[in-house]
Amino acid sequence: MSAAVLEQPVLGSRRLSNFLVASAVTIGGVGFLLASLSSYLGRDLVPIGHPAALVFVPQGLVMGLYSLAAALLATYLWYVIAVNVGGGSNRFDKDAGVVTISRRGFRKPVLVEIPLKDVKAVKVEVRDGFNARRRVALRIQGRRDMPLTRVGEPLPLAQLEKDGAELARFLGVNLEGL
């Protein structure tokens, strides 16, 4: 790439936390299914406890419904991880005079192109508390701020400042919010 192009990858849903949650839901769902089947068949299919001693109606049946709910949730989580929803890139091309923000969606990619002349500033937003928000956004003339950072776990403050300053320097615009 030339010095007139800056490309930033954006992490999507392929994060360790999502893998751990999807794995836990899958294992829990299989456990509930085995407990439900154990109560129906009258044989212990799970090495822990004695689920065969459970009465199938209502306890075994409810565990079967829990396993169905877990299977649906796990399918959704593994699909989101496989597609890498939210992943993509931010591409700033001075030669073409355009900012291209691309993300992977559920069904189709999301592509936003903004002329560089419409970018007024780079905004660094820091809000601490229960619902913390740390993000870098583009302040665009005539539009709402366009977020550039990943969704989920907040970035460290030093990394946020570094990314914002680097982008503002590259684009030749002001850095706001610090």
Swiss-Prot record:
Q: Which GO terms describe its biological process?
A: photosynthesis
Q: What superkingdom heads the lineage?
A: Bacteria
Pfam families found in the cross-reference section: Ycf4
As for membrane topology, the entry says: Multi-pass membrane protein
Disulfide-linked positions: none
Q: What is its main location?
A: membrane
Task: Please tell me whether the keyword Transport is annotated for this protein.
Answer: no
Q: Which InterPro entries match?
A: PSI_Ycf4_assembly
The regions listed as transmembrane in this protein's record are: 19-39, 61-81
Gene Ontology CC: one annotated term: plasma membrane-derived thylakoid membrane
The UniProt keywords, alphabetically, are: Membrane, Photosynthesis, Thylakoid, Transmembrane, Transmembrane helix
Subcellular location per UniProt equals: Cellular thylakoid membrane
Family affiliation: Belongs to the Ycf4 family.
**HAMAP family per UniProt:** Ycf4 (MF_00437)
- Entry function: Seems to be required for the assembly of the photosystem I complex.
Q: What is the protein name given in its UniProt record?
A: Photosystem I assembly protein Ycf4
List the source organism: Synechococcus sp. (strain CC9605)
